[in-house]
Amino acid sequence: MGSSANNPNLTPIDLTVHQRASTRKPSFWSGLGWRDGVFAVLMIALFAYGGLKNRDLMDVYEEVILVFSVLSIVLLGWFWRPLQWIFAVVAAISLLAVSWYGGDLTRGETVFGLKYMFASQPLVMWMSVLFILATVAYWVGLIWPKLTTISWLGSKLTYAGLVMGSAALMVRWYESYLIAPDVGHIPVSTLYEVFILFALLTTAFYLYYEEHYD
C-alpha cells in the first residue's frame, strides 16, 4: 500500500492538512506519565502537611506564597524531569537533618551525621568538592573525547553537587530559626547564601542544556 502522498483521491489541501497533522508535536499534557502524577501528589501532600502544621504562624500572604511554590515545583518537575528526583532527594536530606537536630542547634556539633554530612556548612563543603571533581572530569573528557565515561562521571558529580547545595540552603533555613525565631530568614539574605544560590542556578541551567543538546 502506498502512502497518503501517493493517493490520487487526496486534494492538495488534504495533503497539506495531513502533513501538518503528522508533523505536529504532542502537547505538553499528553506527554505526562504516571510518575509525573505521583510526583505531583507527593509534593502537594508534603506542602499541605507543612502548611496545615504551621497554619497558625502564617498570614494570608505566606499561604499564597506556599500555594504558588508547590505549583511552581510541580510544573518545573514536569518540564524537566530530573528535577523530580532532585527535589525528592533534597527533601529527604532536609527532613533527615531536621529530625537529627531535634530543635537543638548544638547537636550540629555532636551528632556525627550533622557535623560531617548534613548540617548546612558540611553540605556546602560537599557541594564545593563535588563541583571541583566534576570540573576536573569535564576537562579530562574535553581533552580526551574518547573517554566518554569520564564525561558521564562529570555529569553525575555535578548532579550530586546540585543536590548537596540545594539541601544546604534548606537546612540553613531551619538552622536560622534554631538560633532565634527573629533571626530566622529565607536563605538568600546574605552574600554567602547568594553565592551558593548563584552556583546552584548556574549548575541547573548547565545540566538542562547538557541534556537538551546531548
Each model region followed by its residue ranges:
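Hydrophobic cores of alpha-helical transmembrane segments in multi-pass integral membrane proteins
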Residues: 2-110, 119-214
